[in-house]
């Protein structure tokens, strides 16, 4: 999706810039509910010789991997937040080696320096449409509980591309049964940040055996009358890294996003 020029160099992005500054200074915390009204993004950084494989993977799997921006090789910058540094301005990073998680760190500068050809992909995040849902009176449980959103690896395979393969990851939010249609309608207006849910109820149908044991993030309460609603998730690329044995990658830690200067309205369909 092309961003209108009027949204670039957005002058009212002080909340987003302040949030990034706190992460640059060392704060580690999930970003749900932070800088409301601004688009958040997942990130995966790959060597140049893997970048085309991933671009094709994202094109074939736009629901979990909606690409918002791609950096030039070797550049830690993005037009989504002029002046930001992708090596330092996320609260928590993951370093991957040969498809295995090697390290979590609040500063990816040293890992980034290992190669001069790294390409960063910023991928839409469902945190972006949480603010409109809250404004519509729909509770977001992990925001209420100040925890991370629960995420699960499903049995739904993504379309492979080149050397990349893997299953879809989903995020889950408990929604009152009477508001599921509203949640789907609101999120569906934001196709660039995962859009409408991919599954409602019956978690076992998508390979989730126990909602109290998410693969990423934190478990949340599901109250009587609520239904688990699942959205495609930008942690899906990390599942591909693991399934494909990618030799080197840097990603955001699940729930710890890059906050852009772009208002969420820029991605409202």
Swiss-Prot record:
Entry EC number(s): 4.2.1.-
Which branch of life, at top level? Bacteria
The name this protein goes by in its record: Putative hydro-lyase Atu3911
Statement: the UniProt record of this protein carries the keyword Lyase? yes
- Which family does the UniProt entry place this protein in? Belongs to the D-glutamate cyclase family.
Q: Does the keyword Lyase apply?
A: yes
Species assigned in the record: Agrobacterium fabrum (strain C58 / ATCC 33970)
Please name the HAMAP family in this protein's record: Hydro_lyase (MF_01830)
Q: Which NCBIfam families match?
A: PRK05463.1
This entry's Gene Ontology molecular function terms read: lyase activity
Enumerate the UniProt keywords alphabetically.
Lyase
């Amino acid at each position: 999706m092309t961003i209108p020029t009027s949204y670039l160099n957005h002058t009212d992005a002080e909340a987003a810039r302040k949030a990034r500054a706190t992460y640059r200074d060392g704060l580690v915390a999930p970003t749900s509910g932070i800088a409301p009204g601004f688009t958040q993004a997942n990130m995966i950084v790959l060597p140049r010789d893997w970048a085309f494989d991933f671009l094709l993977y994202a094109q074939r799997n736009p629901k979990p991997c909606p690409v918002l921006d791609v950096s030039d090789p070797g550049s830690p910058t993005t037009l989504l937040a002029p002046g930001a540094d992708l090596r330092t301005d996320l609260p928590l990073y993951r370093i991957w080696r040969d498809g295995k998680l090697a390290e979590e760190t609040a500063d990816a500068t040293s890992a980034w320096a290992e190669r001069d050809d790294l390409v960063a992909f910023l991928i839409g995040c469902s945190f972006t449409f949480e603010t409109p849902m809250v404004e519509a009176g729909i509770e977001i449980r992990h925001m209420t509980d100040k925890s991370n959103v629960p995420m699960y690896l499903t049995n739904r395979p993504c379309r492979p591309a080149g050397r990349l393969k893997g299953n879809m990851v989903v995020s889950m939010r408990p929604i009152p049964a009477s508001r599921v249609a509203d949640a789907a309608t609101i999120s569906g207006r934001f196709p660039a940040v995962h859009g409408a849910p991919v599954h409602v109820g019956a978690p076992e149908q998508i390979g989730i055996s126990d909602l109290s044991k998410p693969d990423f993030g934190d478990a949340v309460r599901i109250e009587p009358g609520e239904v688990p609603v699942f959205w495609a998730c930008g942690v899906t690329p990390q599942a591909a890294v693991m399934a494909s044995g990618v030799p080197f990658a840097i990603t955001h830690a699940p729930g710890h996003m890059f906050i852009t200067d772009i208002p969420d309205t820029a991605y409202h369909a």
